[in-house]
Amino acid sequence: MTHATEDVVGAEGSADERARQVEQQMTDEERFSLVISIFGWAPRMFPTKDPRIPDGTNMSAGYTPGVPRLGIPAIQSSDASMGVTNPGYRPDDPGATAFPSLIALGSSFNPSLVREGGEAIGREARSRGFNVQLAGGCNLARDPRNGRNFEYYSEDPYLSAVLAAEQVNGIQSQGVTSTLKHFSLNCNETNRHWLDARIDPDAHREADLLAFQIAIERSHPGAIMSGYNKINGEYAGGNGHLLNDVLKGAWGYPGYVMSDWGATLSWDFALKGLDQESGVQGDMVFWGKEPFTDDLRQAYADGKLPEERLHDMVLRILRSLFAVGADQWGPAPEVDLDRYHAIALQGARQGIVLLKNDGALPLAADQPLKVALIGGFAQEGVASGTGSGAVNPVGGFADVVPIGGAGIMGGSRNLFLFRPSPLELLKKALPQAKLDFDPGYTPAEAAMTAKRNDVVVAFAVRVEGEGYDNADLSLPWGQDAMIDAVAAANPNTIVVLETGNPTSMPWRDKVQAIVQAWYPGQAGAQAIAEILTGAVNPSGRLPITFPESLDQTPRPQLPGHGTPWGTAVTIDYNEGAEIGYRWMAKTGAQPMYAFGHGLSYTSFEYSDLTVTGGETVTAMFTVTNTGDRAGGDVPQLYLTDAAGEKRMRLLGFERVELEPGQSRQVTLTADPRLLARYDGTASQWRVAAGTHRVALARAANDEQASAEVELTGYLFGS
């Protein structure tokens, strides 16, 4: 893929100098125009186009006028992390590549693949005139009910950081600024505008903030988007400690902080570190004003907003545009939709996780099987998540099923289905088989279909998305009962799940195989068919823990769920940094399926583990494919004990592709912060001196080898 801006990307010194030179020539009126963005015309939310957007402007998620006399381009942004979206306000848009959900890409454990997807998204964004992509979902999947988990990579800070950074790197390589979002603790959707997320500050640094810190260091995103929620009583967009002291102070972040749409409550958020109010009409809807328009100007006139702060806000925005070369664009680049589809297909293939297989898979493509396909809209397409990140694919959706709901996001809550359908692709993949389809609307009819066939593939979907959390982990619309009835009628049942989160699976012991397909994007049906028939060997690994029940989680009951829209909610994240697999290790609970779990049609063996210490841990080992098929594996290195303290941390991983009998040596070196505790009194990280135990594992609860190593005690970083 052509990197059109290699001469300017990363040229931070020249970007800083140019920003200073240009900013000095701006008028205050031009400066104020740069610190807001105007939500593009969306008929579902705003019936008329905002008059501040010039006629002929390509409508976008956010528009900020440029300053042509100084070479400053207009800023036009688009959602999001799974492709360039079109949420209802570009009727002539041809559609874009719909990549797999981020949690599916998280299951790939493949940074280079995520980078390729980011490059494609950046190029498609640029071809449409968007120079800011609202991508880089870096929140941690703390709660398996969070409706937006499909927009995030994982529950682990390190895995999330590495993958989010590569998406940002890919996007920005195309001359498009990328965000990293949502800073921070935007981990539940229930009444998110009124949610106060409470957490111990040191634990926050070791988990959610560490994910952002590592991702920023690895990718230098042009913008950080704040969340809707409060953190310890202060709104994310006006949290001076997090924005000024941590992000811009301790970490030295040089880019700009934008609010989420409708998340700026007051002009004084500018004093607390917010540089741009995004989607100003959203603030008018929620709070009855646009704080960075009249209020900010008045504060400046009254001397409450210092001149140097206004200059700093503008400098940060200019610097980010210039750093990627967004001011030097030539003609719109050509896009290669076939190549992008191939990237999306590879993401779906590597993101699908085989959770269980009692010999039912792969299906024999050359056998005259009678196969029942039941449920999950498998005759129409594969499911996608909802909200601002939903991508309108080239050629449009196979179907859009309205769901609705309370609150401002109710109108965009739909079941989106991408063509082609699993039914169509499985017919091609099983040319000797006779396929028998039932929609799965009633358990009795589904059971009759199951009984008259050799094997059953039952599909199940769940609608999840922005603005809503799930009440529990069950499947909607009676699908658990349907699967239970089908499995009772024909034990040779395979279940394919298209969801954005773990599910409860009360029928788990009654079926022969379970495939977690997530929301697999526009190429999902092909990937599912290839996995089921063995054309592709499954290699995905879970980036989120699947609990046996919500009783194993820190909050069996979700605070505020079911309360009216607009209700103030407080969530105490008392688990601190012990999220997901870390919580399971701390409590001794055994999950249904552990973080890192995933089966294959081949087998792998680990050997020759050697570990060295000092200031960090370096592990070397050999991975061998001991089976008869080529396949991908993801060996994982964990800290399990730190100088006598039981502590579970993913230290590293590497995806390896091996032919039968092939071996490869892997070396993993841990970021020292993963071995440390954050010491808030010293404002530094502290590694404890002494013996540390590390484990080489297939999953968080599946150790294959372990070793002890001595580490030097020391303070470092910030």
Question: What are the residue ranges of the model-derived segments?
Answer:
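Glycoside hydrolase catalytic-domain context in secreted enzymes
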Residues: 1-678, 684-701, 708, 715-718
